[in-house]
Amino acid sequence: MNIAPEKNCDLCPRLAEFRQANVQQYPSFYNAPVPAFGELDSELLIVGLAPGLKGANQSGRPFTGDYAGIILYSALQKYAFAQGEYEPEKFFVGGKDSFSLNNCRVSNSVRCVPPDNKPTPSEITTCNNFLSNEIAAMKKLKVIVSLGQIAHKSVISIFNRKQADYKFAHGAKHKLENIILLNSFHTSRYNINTGRLSQAMFDAVIGEARNLIA
């Protein structure tokens, strides 16, 4: 049961081709399927969309190096799901920071960076197999936070539920067997700049996750 694709995964030809082009253009980048961050025995799972070109695709760690990570990891630290110093710039010179997660794991619906940050439906479906296996392997999992509608739909699909019965809405809470799914708008710079999401709004979602787990 594979919870992550191989580093040279070619299951999605378009993504593999884009990855290879990035190897040529950005040879110092990670340029491979980005593995999840955090332990499998965690009670909280954050599911994002996909690595950003100059974020996780560069650093090799989810939400590390782009604006979305600042919002996400700030909230996780606030509610004791993370500790240490979040210093993404260290990854770009071959180093690492002291940042770590507590009882939390961060993953993505799609593990490879897609062109224009837009995976196709078939790419989402293909990579969903890894996310499904990952969720199944998290035996202590209590809460999933989906960042954005695609991540939400991926989780609903994994639990074999009808999408129409589980509408995405920021702050919404859904019961999936013995797991609670919380919805949030994605922590992207675009959502922050347009006012769709604020740090306080996102903090409230992570605070709810803490209440459900505590």
What do the PLM-derived regions correspond to, one by one?
Residues 1-168, 174, 179-214:
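A polyanion-binding, active-site-adjacent surface
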